[in-house]
């Protein structure tokens, strides 16, 4: 039996929490971070602002950028709510950050129920937190992670098998693989 692995990734997690707290921030470019961008809203990403860049560089790209401090306590509180929901589904989970994780659904759902489960999971997260997440389902963690990035934000993608996955990545740049970034090409 082929494994069913789901990767979930909260969409612009810290920025989305701040927008929930202050709805006037909706549709505005904002980042969470002090010297370094921890999370950028989707509006900020339109200016090529991304995580791990200097806030000063981000402000050069978008002079009207709103910069908010990190509220780790609140982010962890909401992350724990999500974790508790997931642990009601199964304990075969690997939480890799406050905003993402892998869930082994092999013993939880039938293969033909992947799409329905992905939709229901996203809806349940939205009901619980008023936040959106993206989901990828596949046969292993790497392909599930790549799948979760395909239809962001608030989307999902499913690779039914290895053949589908290989076909999808065959014409993509190596950067699609998590962990392969600029530094990789400097080696």
Predicted regions and their residues:
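Short secondary-structure capping/junction motifs at helix and strand boundaries
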Residues: 91-96, 114, 126-134
């Amino acid at each position: 039996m082929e494994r069913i692995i789901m990767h979930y990734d909260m969409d612009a997690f810290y920025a989305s929490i701040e927008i929930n707290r202050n709805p006037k921030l909706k549709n505005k470019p904002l980042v969470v971070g002090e010297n370094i961008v921890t999370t950028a809203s989707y509006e900020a990403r339109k200016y090529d602002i991304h995580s791990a860049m200097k806030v000063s560089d981000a402000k050069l790209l978008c002079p009207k950028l709103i910069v908010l401090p990190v509220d780790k306590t609140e982010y962890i509180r909401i992350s724990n709510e999500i974790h508790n929901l997931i642990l009601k589904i199964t304990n075969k989970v690997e939480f890799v950050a406050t905003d993402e994780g892998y869930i082994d659904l092999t013993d939880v759902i039938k293969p033909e129920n992947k799409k329905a489960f992905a939709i229901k999971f996203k809806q349940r997260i939205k009901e619980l937190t008023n936040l959106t997440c993206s989901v990828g389902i596949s046969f292993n963690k790497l392909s599930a992670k790549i799948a979760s990035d395909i239809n962001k934000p608030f989307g999902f993608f499913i690779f039914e098998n290895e053949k589908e996955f290989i076909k999808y990545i065959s014409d993509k740049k190596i950067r699609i693989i998590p962990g392969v970034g600029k530094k990789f090409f400097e080696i």
